[in-house]
């Protein structure tokens, strides 16, 4: 049985990781061992932040709705309660877009909500 050296396969594996860590700072882009650790950690951060992104955007939408609703003399919680009571099922993303991009439609919605005592 002949001996098989692993230089070619390891070089390919190293090049693959170093290519993925190209823009990293310092040894993280040059040294394979450190680059591999940085690559693994980057994957962990990416996985975590894909989950956190959903939370962050929900917070942003709520802040936008709250600030727009307070200009009309309502609180966010009161507005959401009344909107559910009217059976208007618009999610927070669409409500925040209305508040920012289409102020006339949002003010009409608030008039409708204010008509309920």
Swiss-Prot record:
Alphabetical list of PROSITE patterns matching this protein: RIBOSOMAL_L20
Q: CDD domains this protein is in?
A: Ribosomal_L20
According to its record, what are the GO cellular component terms?
ribonucleoprotein complex; ribosome
InterPro entries membership = Ribosomal_bL20, RIBOSOMAL_L20_CS, Ribosomal_protein_bL20_C
* Summary of the function given for this chain in its UniProt record: Binds directly to 23S ribosomal RNA and is necessary for the in vitro assembly process of the 50S ribosomal subunit. It is not involved in the protein synthesizing functions of that subunit.
> NCBIfam families, from UniProt?
rplT_bact
Protein family according to the UniProt entry: Belongs to the bacterial ribosomal protein bL20 family.
Protein name per the record: Large ribosomal subunit protein bL20
Gene coding for it:
rplT
């Amino acid at each position: 049985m002949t001996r098989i050296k692993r230089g070619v396969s390891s070089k390919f594996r190293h090049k693959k990781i170093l290519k993925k860590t190209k823009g990293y700072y310092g040894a993280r882009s040059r040294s394979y061992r450190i680059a591999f650790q940085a690559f693994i950690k980057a994957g962990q951060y990416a996985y975590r932040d894909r989950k956190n992104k959903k939370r962050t955007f929900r917070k942003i939408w709520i802040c936008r709705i709250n600030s727009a609703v307070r200009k009309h003399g309502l609180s966010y919680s009161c507005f959401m309660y009344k909107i559910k009571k009217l059976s208007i099922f618009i999610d927070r993303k669409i409500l925040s877009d209305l508040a920012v991009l289409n102020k006339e439609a949002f003010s009409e919605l608030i008039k409708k909500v204010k008509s309920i005592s």
